[in-house]
Amino acid sequence: MLHAGLVSAPYITVDDTGARHARDSFHTTQIGAEHFTAFRTTASKSRLNFLSLLRGSYQDYVLNDAAFDYLDGRRADPALVAKIRSHEPRRFCDQVPFLEYLAGKGIDIFDRQAVRVLAEAGIWGSIRHHGLLGDTVIVSDDAGQFRVGNHALCWVYAERLLQKLMPATPRQVRQVEAVRDLVWRFYRALKSVKRKPPPGLAAAFRKRFARIFSLRTGYEDLDKLLARLSRRKDELLKVLERPDIPLHTNASENDLRSFVTKRKISGGTMSRDGRVARDTMLGLMKTCKKLGLSFWHYLGDRLGLDGQAIAPLAALVAAKA
């Protein structure tokens, strides 16, 4: 099901939350779109882990053009990249031959920082090799692990940063309120244009964005935040290029509520099977709801009970694309 979504969805929204497993702190990542939801609970919430989730059930590493573009984007050490660059793509069935190849090229495989970025590139190459995330936009908050591929930034998260400011004087309070008002007005205008984008308005929105986020108020924390958000202009205005994507990750937060409810009721998991079963069942439940199916009837069909036959969810997700 996740594979079908990653192949066919025009966008995905992602988020994560804490989880308990085997008396330890784990992290549950939500990956979803209009017609599917998947949960994956892992010990790490790194970018390497997130890319591994986006790779789906594949375990291979591929050093191709996409992998080297990734390394260029991450500003990897050119000397390191030169050691593994080749004219033809190289594919490795799993981590062991990949590390053997790196060692054979004179790379210290115990240098975790160097190997991590190379592994990220190899996984990203695998993702593109298998046709996943073709033109898919990844919409997320500002968590660093999610900033891969064609990324868009959640507007609601950006505005929350303004809420978190702690103005010390009445004048600073008024400045923050004025900027928040400008941002919400811009957001509402962007939302209305998104529904029916008229031609030629993208340039006007970019100019308006620049006017708002280039403001300098004299309140240092506010000015730094505006400058920071201004640097994320392309990610915040991605909707002008792709009006089919959402402006926020509210759907991800809604999906995660079911996980949080389950966590409050039954606590954590102890075994790997229990962890996978919980993630799988919650993902199936949310996907059935998005597809307009009864989860109860879906389970009955899979258990062989009499009733209406339901096609595989992966096929239904792909058909909705």
From Swiss-Prot:
It comes from Sinorhizobium fredii (strain NBRC 101917 / NGR234). Pfam families: DDE_Tnp_IS66. Keywords: Plasmid. InterPro entries: Transposase-related (IPR052344), Transposase_IS66_central (IPR004291). This is Uncharacterized protein y4jO. PANTHER family: BLL1576 PROTEIN. It comes from the Bacteria.
